[in-house]
Amino acid sequence: MSDMAMIRIGILIAGLLLVAAIFLFGRPKKSPQGRRVDKGEGQPRERREPVISSEFGAEGDAAERAEGVEQSELNLEGQDASGGNEVGKRPNQDFDKIVSLFVAAKAGQVLRGEDVVVVAEKTGLVFGHMNVFHRLVEGHPERGPIFSMASILKPGSFDMANIREMQTPAIAFFLTLPAPMTALDAWEKMLPTVQRMAELLDGVVLDDSRNALGRQRVAHIRDELRAYDRQHQAPPLTKSPRW
């Protein structure tokens, strides 16, 4: 694989978190202090391409090729937000946390769109809102996705009419919180699905830093999600004082 191809893979993976946050799930909740608004916000602006903060080596696996990439803004203007159907649409577009994983092709290989679709269906994902795949709560699709899966190639969707021609260096999985179940339970649904898809596609599971997902990182994510659940659980009811 050429250096240019590896650079492109790194750029796409680095920018995908922002793609998912804006393209798939709307806008994050506003902080209590609000945010600073630039003068030119809301106006047409010049396209800004991702940049590379360090050089890539000529060898290494998918994780190593993605090292050293600095996340930057991708242009999503003009994308159709109504693609696909309503299956997997979040009831509320606000979110406050995203947990992501990737399945990347091994060095010198790509993931074929047709294979991705077959494996997604085998692992219980359904095609729906935004033309991407979702894991839904069984019997309650109206509650929205437990997690979603998209291609890292812009715009992230799967064009079923041309799926046989589609190739992508990686696919991304997003657990967007709050979810229709506890954060930890949602993670326990997503992780084995990602691992199984990686096995069937002969790919590599990467974490949100584009490193190979290991036990220590999994344990750390579980701890983070336990803390999130504690923070967002309903406060206990106080007992009425005896008179």
From Swiss-Prot:
Highest taxon of the lineage = Bacteria
What SUPFAM superfamilies is this protein classified in?
Cell-division protein ZipA, C-terminal domain
What is the topology of this protein in the membrane according to its UniProt annotation? Single-pass type I membrane protein
For the Cytoplasmic compartment, the record's topological domain ranges are 26-243
This entry carries the following GO cellular component terms, namely:
cell division site; plasma membrane
**InterPro entries named among the record's database cross-references:** Cell_div_ZipA, ZipA_FtsZ-bd_C, ZipA_FtsZ-bd_C_sf
Compartments, record wording: Cell inner membrane
Q: Which family does it belong to?
A: Belongs to the ZipA family.
Which HAMAP family does the record cross-reference, listed alphabetically? ZipA (MF_00509)
Describe, as the record does, how this protein assembles with itself and its partners.
Interacts with FtsZ via their C-terminal domains.
Q: What is this protein called?
A: Cell division protein ZipA
